């Protein structure tokens, strides 16, 4: 009798998953990872992405072991290793002289943490997620689907799209980024706040560079820093440069920046760094303002929940923004599997993820101050990888 009761409860959980309609708003890394994790767990998922087409845009991304551990668990290991670069180390250097101040050794991270430290083109990760999702749940990704608003109702949520279409779901997961319209409507009306940092990015064909410049390095000082590293099997070198600004009024993530103005901004850097940033593919450099939001104590309202940058945006200096969204995806999936109702699952998700995401957000801000401060060894104390890399969202305790 005991076995029969236990079996009945288990089957009820399975049926609940199969019958629960989950809508994910946003087809970025966080949304797609969530979709893949949830479809593999047996949930019925639809991803609504506003873009009519997803293309090979964007630049590089760092995936530390806490992120790759989740992605490998989801079966993406071969896809990532086909294009990613595993750097042996990253050197932190004086902006003007190029002298090495600190080395972060990454070549042994797979052995130490049980998962690798990877650098890759953002599109390569996104494409791998799209491909795997299509294999697991054909038709789950709906492009050209711009959600105007969500309205929680009696046990379901209604989604209204820009074209007037209506859909309903049992759960809505907002993975629509720092400018999340769902967060604006249901959680916190305050707009994103400019943090005082502006970033530029570009890609360089490594065939156009001397071999000794094709490396992972961070040059910093003079209120600026430039991070560069190889992606796409070493065929491209990605760079991201950051400087202080008092204000920012432009809109968008892909604002073309005049190359001469960009080079003038970083003219005080060492010759090797200047050579790298002077040779972007097709002379293209893009800029954007770095924004933040006040910390949000509650990430859910009824059957609507926030994930990734929509919940806890962070500055890029820790290299953990995408990793935290990936962790969110796995933890939220586990919570929905374990709890009887979405509301209970969201409360457990908040208790599990809130403290860790808050710590990462705070540390990212502190590292920004260090990286754009004085270039010395003291400014890099605490940069050694720690508990954040050892974290395992696949098996960590919930709650």
Label each residue range with its predicted role.
Residues 3-4, 10-21, 97, 278, ...:
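Helical substrate-recognition/capping region of FAD-dependent monooxygenase/halogenase enzymes
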Residues 23, 27-52, 173-174, 200, ...:
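Conserved mid-domain beta->alpha element of the FAD-binding
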Residues 252-287:
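Flavin-binding catalytic cores
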Residues 53-69:
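Conserved N-terminal glycine-rich FAD pyrophosphate-binding loop of Rossmann-like flavoproteins
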Residues 78, 206-212, 339:
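Short helix-loop capping/hinge motifs at secondary-structure junctions, enriched
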Residues 10, 14-18, 22, 39, ...:
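Conserved N-terminal helical subregion
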Residues 215-249, 263-268, 290:
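Active-site substrate-recognition segment that forms the wall
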Residues 23, 46, 140, 238-240:
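A structural signal for isolated positions on well-ordered beta-strands in alpha/beta enzyme cores
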